[in-house]
C-alpha cells in the first residue's frame, strides 16, 4: 500500500533519512528529458537539402499566450499580488530559468550556452552593482558597435569598459522585458522548415548588418545559400594575435604573433598601466612597451599585405574579438585595416580563450553549426527539481540495512535524533498492518558543477618566516603578549617555533616569590632605577633578592638581565651587573643577555663592565666582543664629530653649486631671449667702452651683461673654443646651423 503524498518516509540506505522535497503522488511519472538538438554544419548545406526547404523566419512563438499562462513563480517574475519577487529570493524554481536575464530554457545544454554569453555575464555584473539590466535587443544593439571586450574573458580587460555599456533607454529596456518571448537568444535567429523542424543559426554568419527592421528575405536567402563563403577571423588579447582567412572549411592563410606585453600576476597590458598614470621605469616595463610597439607594427604590416588586404576587401563576414585597450591594432590611425562602421564586422558572440589558430577554427566551427529541433525550442519545458520515485524493497534487505546503520558513527546520526521518534512510530503502525512491502524514497540530485567555466582551488598559504623574525627584532618596543593556556587541546608542533622575547619574559614567574619577582621584573622593563636600587639594597639582608638575579625562571629561561637588555634599559643593565648578575647565563635557546639587547647603547654597558671587571666572568661565553674604554669612546665621539662636520660642509658646497647652476641657467635663458639687434647693440657698446678705456655702459639686466655667450642658446663660452661666422660666436656647429637657417642663410 503506497503512502500518501504528504507523508515522510524512512530510507533504507546507509541509515540516512530522506524526505520528499515536493509533494507528489507516488504513481506520478517523472518528467521526460527533452531531446538533445541535432547539429548540422552550415557550410555543408546546398540549395537542394531537404532541411532548408520551405524555410520561414520565426518571430514569435505560436503558443506565446500559453507560454505566459499562470505558472509556478520564478525569481524575478510578477506575483499574483502585483509585487515583484526579489531576484535574491530563496525559492527553488521548477524550471530552467535565469533570473538575471529573465530567460526560460528547454534543456541543460541551452542553459549552459546562455551562461557563457556576454549578455548574461554583463547582466550579472550590472545586478551586483545595483544598476539596471540590459534587455536582449539593447545588448545586441550595443554589442554591434564592438564594446564587449571587457566581458569576453580576455586576460587584458579593463573595468572601465563595463561602465560604457549602459542601456540606451533604461525605461524602455525595463518595459520590454515582460513582452520578450520565452527562449529568446541574442545573436541567434530561429527558422522553421517545411517539415516542421526548427533551426537555430547565429546571426553573424547570415550576412552583414541591416538597418532595423531586418529583412527576412535576405536572412533566408543567406541561409539557403550556405552562408558566406569567405570569412576573416581576427582575435587579439594580452600580447597574442591570431588571424585566419577561410574559404568554406578550407584555410587560405593564417598567422599568429606573440609578444611579452603583460606582466605576470598583474593581468593588464603595459600601455593600459601607463594610461592610468602609473608609468614604471623598470627594464621589464620598457621591454613591454617595446613589444607593444612591435606587435602593433607586425599586425599592421600583415593586414596591409596583398593577401590580407584583398581578403579583408572581399570577405563577406569579418569576425572580430579584441579587448578595449587592444583595439588600436585594427582601428584608428593611418591605414587602419578595419573601420568601425563596416556592416560586415561582427563581434564574436562566444566566450573565447587565448588567441591561437586552433581557437579560430573552433570559433568558426561553433558559429557555422545549426541546431535542429523537432519541436519549438521555446515551448519545451523541463522541471529543474530532484527526480523522486517510490521503489519497493523486500524484507530481506532490512537486516542488511540495520547492519549498515551500525557501521555509521554515532556523531553522524546526532542531528537526526530528534526526528527519528515520530518516524519510527509511523513505520511501526505500517508493520502492524501486515504489509510485506516497504517503500523507499530515492532522491536523484542534478549537479551543476559542469556549468563552471574554471576550477576554483583554495589558495595555498605561504610560510611567513620573515614576519616572525621582524616580530622578534621588535619585541623590545611592544608590550607583553598574552600567554596561551597550558591545557589547550591543540597538539604541540614537532618543529621548534620561534617565540617573541616579550612572551618569554612574561612567562618567567618565580614559584616561591611571585610578588617579589613581579616587582623586580616591572622595574627592569620600565627602567625604574630607584625602585631597583631599593630592592637590591634590601638584598643584603634578604637572600631571596640575590637568588633571583641569576635564576632562569619560566619556560623561556629568561633572567632579569635578559629582560632589561631586551627592553633597552642601559642603566638597569649596569645596576644589575654591579649587583652581581651573571652575563653568561643563557636562556632556553642558548642566548646570553648581550645577544638579546635592543640597541647599541645597551650592548655598550656590557663592554664597559667588561673593561672594569676583566676577569670576573667568561666573556667569550657571554659573547661580549671586547672591552670599551674611555679612550675608545673619545675616539668614536671625535670620529662622529668629524664625520658630521664633513657632511655639513659637503651639504653647503652642494647647495652653493646648485645655486650657481640655477643662476647660470637663468642668465642663459635671459640672454637667449634677447633679439639679435639687442645682442649686437650690447656687444658694440662693450667694444666701444673697451677701446675708450671707459667703464662699460649700463645694461638692462646684470643677468645678461656678459656677451661672452653662445649667440643661439646662451651657453657661456668660458673655457670653450667658440665657432664664429661674421660677428657671431657659437658653442657648437649645431647652434651655428640653427642660427643660419633662422637668418635665411642655409649652411653649405
Swiss-Prot record:
Keywords: ANK repeat, Coiled coil, Cytoplasm, Endonuclease, Hydrolase, Metal-binding, Nuclease, Phosphoprotein, Repeat, Zinc, Zinc-finger. It comes from Mus musculus. ANK repeats lie at residues 515-545, 556-585. Residues 484-497 have a biased composition (Polar residues). Residues 155-167, 429-438 have a biased composition (Acidic residues). Residues 654-666 are annotated as: VCP/p97-interacting motif (VIM). The modification Phosphoserine is found at residues 282, 385, 555, 702. Its EC number is 3.1.-.-. Residues 169-179, 383-408, 632-677 have a biased composition (Basic and acidic residues). Endonuclease that cleaves polypeptidyl-tRNAs downstream of the ribosome-associated quality control (RQC) pathway to release incompletely synthesized polypeptides for degradation. The RQC pathway disassembles aberrantly stalled translation complexes to recycle or degrade the constituent parts. ANKZF1 acts downstream disassembly of stalled ribosomes and specifically cleaves off the terminal 3'-CCA nucleotides universal to all tRNAs from polypeptidyl-tRNAs, releasing (1) ubiquitinated polypeptides from 60S ribosomal subunit for degradation and (2) cleaved tRNAs. This is tRNA endonuclease ANKZF1. One of its GO terms (molecular function) is catalytic activity, acting on a tRNA. The keyword ATP-binding does not apply. Belongs to the ANKZF1/VMS1 family. Transmembrane segments: none annotated. PANTHER family: ANKYRIN REPEAT AND ZINC FINGER DOMAIN-CONTAINING PROTEIN 1 (PTHR16036), TRNA ENDONUCLEASE ANKZF1 (PTHR16036:SF2). InterPro entries: Ankyrin_rpt (IPR002110), Ankyrin_rpt-contain_sf (IPR036770), ANKZ1/VMS1 (IPR047139), VATC (IPR041540), VLRF1/Vms1 (IPR041175), Znf_C2H2_type (IPR013087). The VLRF1 domain mediates binding to the 60S ribosomal subunit. Residues 143-154 have a biased composition (Low complexity). It is found in: Cytoplasm.
Amino acid at each position: 500500500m503506497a503512502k500518501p503524498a504528504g507523508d515522510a518516509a524512512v530510507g533504507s540506505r546507509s541509515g540516512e533519512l530522506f524526505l520528499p522535497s515536493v509533494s507528489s503522488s507516488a504513481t506520478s511519472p517523472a518528467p521526460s528529458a527533452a531531446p538533445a538538438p541535432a547539429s548540422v554544419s552550415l557550410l555543408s548545406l546546398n540549395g537542394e537539402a531537404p532541411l532548408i526547404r520551405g524555410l520561414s523566419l520565426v518571430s514569435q512563438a505560436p503558443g506565446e499566450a500559453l507560454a505566459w499562462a499562470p505558472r509556478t513563480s520564478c525569481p524575478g517574475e510578477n506575483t499574483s499580488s502585483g509585487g515583484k519577487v526579489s531576484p535574491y529570493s530563496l525559492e527553488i524554481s521548477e524550471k530552467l530559468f535565469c533570473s538575471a536575464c529573465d530567460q526560460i530554457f528547454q534543456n541543460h545544454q541551452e542553459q549552459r550556452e546562455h551562461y557563457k554569453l556576454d549578455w548574461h555575464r554583463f547582466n550579472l555584473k550590472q545586478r551586483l552593482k545595483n544598476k539596471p539590466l540590459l534587455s536582449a535587443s539593447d545588448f545586441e544593439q550595443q554589442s554591434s558597435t564592438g564594446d564587449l571586450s571587457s566581458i569576453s574573458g580576455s586576460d587584458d580587460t579593463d573595468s572601465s569598459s563595463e561602465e560604457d555599456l549602459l542601456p540606451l533607454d533604461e525605461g524602455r529596456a525595463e518595459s520590454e522585458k515582460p513582452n520578450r518571448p520565452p527562449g529568446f537568444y541574442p545573436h541567434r535567429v530561429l527558422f522553421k522548415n517545411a517539415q516542421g523542424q526548427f533551426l537555430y543559426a547565429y546571426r553573424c554568419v547570415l550576412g552583414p548588418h541591416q538597418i532595423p527592421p531586418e529583412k527576412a528575405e535576405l536572412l533566408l536567402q543567406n541561409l539557403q545559400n550556405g552562408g558566406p563563403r569567405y570569412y576573416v577571423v581576427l582575435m587579439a588579447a594580452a600580447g597574442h594575435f591570431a588571424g585566419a582567412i577561410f574559404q568554406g572549411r578550407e584555410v587560405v592563410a593564417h598567422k599568429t604573433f606573440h609578444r611579452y606585453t603583460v606582466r605576470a600576476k598583474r593581468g593588464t597590458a603595459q600601455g593600459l598601466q601607463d594610461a592610468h598614470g602609473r608609468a614604471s621605469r623598470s627594464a621589464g616595463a620598457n621591454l613591454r612597451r617595446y613589444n607593444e610597439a612591435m606587435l602593433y607594427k607586425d599586425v599592421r604590416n600583415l593586414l596591409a599585405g596583398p593577401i590580407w588586404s584583398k581578403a579583408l576587401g572581399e570577405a563577406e563576414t569579418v569576425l572580430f574579438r579584441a579587448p578595449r585597450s587592444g583595439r588600436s591594432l585594427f582601428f584608428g590611425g593611418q591605414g587602419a585595416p578595419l573601420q568601425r562602421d563596416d556592416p560586415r564586422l561582427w563581434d564574436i558572440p562566444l566566450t573565447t580563450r587565448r588567441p591561437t589558430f586552433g581557437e579560430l577554427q573552433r570559433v568558426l566551427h561553433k558559429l557555422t553549426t545549426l541546431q535542429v529541433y523537432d519541436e519549438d525550442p521555446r515551448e519545451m519545458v523541463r522541471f529543474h527539481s530532484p527526480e523522486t520515485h517510490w521503489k519497493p524493497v523486500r524484507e530481506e534487505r532490512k537486516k542488511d540495512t540495520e547492519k549498515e546503520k551500525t557501521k555509521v558513527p554515532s556523531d553522524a546520526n546526532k542531528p537526526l535524533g530528534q526526528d527519528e521518534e515520530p518516524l519510527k512510530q509511523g513505520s511501526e503502525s505500517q508493520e502492524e498492518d501486515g504489509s510485506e512491502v516497504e517503500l523507499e524514497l530515492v532522491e536523484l540530485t542534478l549537479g551543476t558543477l559542469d556549468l563552471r567555466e574554471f576550477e576554483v582551488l583554495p589558495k595555498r598559504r605561504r610560510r611567513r618566516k620573515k614576519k616572525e623574525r621582524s616580530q622578534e627584532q621588535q619585541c623590545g618596543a611592544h608590550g607583553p603578549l598574552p600567554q596561551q593556556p597550558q591545557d589547550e587541546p591543540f597538539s604541540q608542533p614537532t618543529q621548534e617555533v620561534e617565540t617573541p622575547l616579550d612572551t618569554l619574559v612574561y612567562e618567567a614567574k618565580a614559584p616561591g616569590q611571585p610578588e617579589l619577582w613581579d616587582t623586580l621584573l616591572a622595574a627592569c622593563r620600565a627602567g625604574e632605577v630607584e625602585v631597583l636600587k631599593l630592592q637590591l639594597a634590601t638584598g643584603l639582608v634578604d637572600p631571596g633578592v640575590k637568588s633571583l638575579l641569576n635564576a632562569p625562571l619560566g619556560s623561556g629561561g629568561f633572567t632579569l638581565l635578559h629582560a632589561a637588555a631586551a627592553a633597552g634599559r642601559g642603566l638597569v643593565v649596569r645596576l644589575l651587573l654591579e649587583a652581581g648578575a651573571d652575563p653568561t647565563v643563557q636562556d632556553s635557546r642558548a642566548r646570553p643577555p648581550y645577544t638579546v639587547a635592543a640597541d647599541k647603547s645597551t650592548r655598550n654597558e656590557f663592554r664597559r663592565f667588561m673593561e672594569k671587571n676583566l676577569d670576573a666572568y667568561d666573556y667569550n661565553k657571554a659573547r661580549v666582543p671586547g672591552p670599551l674604554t674611555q679612550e675608545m669612546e673619545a675616539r668614536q665621539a671625535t670620529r662622529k664629530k668629524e664625520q658630521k662636520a664633513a657632511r655639513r660642509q659637503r651639504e653647503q658646497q652642494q647647495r652653493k653649486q646648485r645655486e650657481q647652476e640655477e643662476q647660470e641657467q637663468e642668465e642663459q635663458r635671459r640672454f637667449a631671449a634677447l633679439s639679435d639687434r639687442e645682442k649686437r647693440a650690447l656687444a658694440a657698446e662693450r667694444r666701444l667702452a673697451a677701446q675708450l678705456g671707459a667703464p662699460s655702459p649700463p645694461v638692462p639686466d646684470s643677468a645678461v651683461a656678459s656677451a661672452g655667450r653662445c649667440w643661439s642658446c646662451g651657453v657661456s663660452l668660458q673655457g670653450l673654443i667658440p665657432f664664429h661666422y661674421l660677428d657671431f660666436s657659437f658653442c657648437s656647429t649645431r647652434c651655428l646651423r640653427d642660427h643660419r637657417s633662422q637668418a635665411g642663410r642655409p649652411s653649405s
